[in-house]
Structure formats: structure tokens, C-alpha cells
A protein has these predicted regions:
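Structural signature of tandem alpha-helical TPR/SEL1-like repeats
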Residues: 79-88, 113-126, 147-161, 183-195, ...
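TPR/TPR-like (Sel1-like) alpha-helical repeat modules
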Residues: 204, 208, 212-238
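Helix-start (N-cap) detector for alpha-helical repeat units in TPR-like alpha-solenoids
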Residues: 67, 101-102, 135-136, 170-171, ...
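Alpha-helical segment of the N-proximal tetratricopeptide repeat
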Residues: 63-102, 106-113
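Long, contiguous interaction/recruitment modules in multidomain scaffold/adaptor proteins
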Residues: 1-69, 79-80, 85-88
Length: 267
């Protein structure tokens, strides 16, 4: 299998892009092989006309088919919470198909759930090297640097890289908006939340984020309006994955309502 990647999309590390004025092509090839570790023995890397070509040595069709069956089983094991079994299966898949981005990203997710942040980051870094347009890898990297490593500048770097390829992805925009709010860049956070809601009008996380932003910046009435709009759009029975954010939205509404009524009664 051959993979072609523009040099401009090569990331040399957290917050570091390929720079032709600083990095030679030989350095990039060495970096890529080092990033892939033991996998580099199964691949050839070359650069021509500003494009990296990675050629993976294909396994036999029988081995590939067996690996794909293991991938399906690994996903099932992970969904059922059998993380150690899923870990072994994903690794087994990647021994045969090292360029399988979905398997590698899922492996990173398992590492995250097991608390192995460094391994999760390593696998996601390879995902991005294989496919610089893999949206979920940028989201996960941004989340790692936001929640675990607490480096907001690097988190911003990954969200922005993701948005270069997927400017209208709702989850990327929402996570970036939350990061901007945490950094105190309220105007940009507001723009991002609103853009997300224009793209995904029934996305509870962005309603909650925007409402929280208005509360933090001293606009409780605007916050209440946003939450009321969410409640109108909210399905009668919230999906399980959205139930928590809906509950938080109701609690936030009650808190703001109580605060505004208290101020009104005082005056």
C-alpha cells in the first residue's frame, strides 16, 4: 500500500510543522521512520516534489483478512469494556496492517481509558502521520493536551490543524470554543460556539457552552435565552450520551434564574 502526504502536512512534534527553511528532506525521512518505530522495517519512505511517499510492504491476503476480523472483534471487546483483550487484538491487527488508522486510533483510545497517556499520544501521532486528514486524531490530541497535559497552546495547535482539513466539523469547533473560553478569549469562543450551532442546530454541548460563556461574561439574560432555545429543541427523551449535558443545562438554568430573581428582589 502507498500513502502520499504533502510535506506541509507533516507534523514534526507537538506544535511543530515541517519547515523547508529549517528541516531537510533527509531529516523528515528520519523523523518519520523514528516515529513509526519498529514498523519502519516494513516501509519505505521517499520525498519527491514536496510530497512524502510511504510504501508499506503488504501482507498476504489471508493474513490481511484475518487481521480485519480481529479488528471487528477488538472494537466489540472495547465497547464491552474488555480493554486488555481489545488492546491485544488491536496490536495484533497493526502487526499485519500498520497503516490501519482506525485500528491505531482505537488502540490510542484504549490506552487513554487505561490511563497510559504517553502511548495514546504516540499512536495518535502516527495516525496523523499516516493520514493528516484524520479528524478524530486531531480531536483526541487536542483533548489530551487540554485535559491531561494542560498545555492549551499545543491543544490549540491540534484543533487548528484539524480545522484546516475539516473547517465545518462540529465537534472540533465546539472543543476549540471550550478551549478559547478556558483561555479567556471570550469573543473567539462566542464566534466558534455560534458557528457550531449554525452547522449543528441541535447540538446540546454548544448551547451549554455558549450559555456558560454568557454567564461568565456577565450576561445572564442572554444565557437564559440560549438555554431556553435548547429546551425547546431538546427531544422529549434525551439520548443517553446527551442526558448529562441536558441535566447540567437544567441546573445552570435554575442557578442563573435564582441569581437574577435574587438581584431583582434586592432592588
Amino acid at each position: 500500500m502507498k500513502i502520499y502526504i504533502p510535506l506541509k502536512d507533516i507534523l514534526l512534534g507537538p506544535g511543530e510543522r515541517f519547515d523547508p527553511s529549517v528541516n531537510s528532506e533527509a531529516e523528515v525521512i528520519g523523523f518519520i521512520k523514528k516515529a513509526y518505530g519498529i514498523i519502519s522495517s516494513t516501509m519505505d519512505v521517499s520525498i519527491s516534489d514536496g510530497v512524502v511517499c510511504i510504501v508499506f510492504k503488504d501482507a498476504t491476503p489471508a493474513r490481511v483478512n484475518e487481521a480485519l476480523q480481529k479488528f471487528s472483534k477488538a472494537v466489540s471487546e472495547a465497547q464491552n469494556g474488555n480493554l486488555s483483550d481489545a488492546l491485544k487484538l488491536f496490536k495484533s491487527v497493526l502487526e499485519v496492517i500498520p497503516e490501519h488508522v482506525d485500528a491505531r486510533r482505537n488502540l490510542a483510545k484504549v490506552y487513554l481509558e487505561l490511563g497510559n497517556i504517553e502511548q495514546a499520544e504516540k499512536q495518535l501521532d502516527i495516525c496523523i502521520q499516516i493520514n493528516p486528514q484524520d479528524c478524530w486524531s486531531y480531536i483526541m490530541m487536542g483533548n489530551i493536551y487540554t485535559k491531561h497535559k494542560r498545555d492549551h497552546n499545543i491543544a490549540e495547535f491540534y484543533y487548528e490543524c484539524g480545522l484546516e482539513h475539516h473547517p465545518d466539523d462540529g465537534m472540533l469547533l465546539n472543543n476549540y470554543a471550550n478551549l478559547m473560553m478556558e483561555k479567556g478569549n471570550f469573543s473567539k469562543a462566542e464566534q466558534l460556539f455560534k458557528k457550531t450551532l449554525n452547522l449543528r442546530p441541535v447540538y446540546p454541548n454548544s448551547y451549554f457552552g455558549l450559555a456558560l460563556l454568557y454567564r461568565v461574561t456577565g450576561h445572564p439574560e442572554e444565557s437564559l435565552k440560549v438555554l431556553e432555545r435548547l429546551f425547546i429543541l431538546m427531544p422529549k427523551t434525551a439520548e443517553i450520551e446527551s442526558a448529562q449535558i441536558y441535566n447540567e443545562a437544567r441546573n445552570l438554568y435554575s442557578e442563573i434564574k435564582a441569581e437574577t430573581e435574587s438581584k431583582t428582589s434586592i432592588h
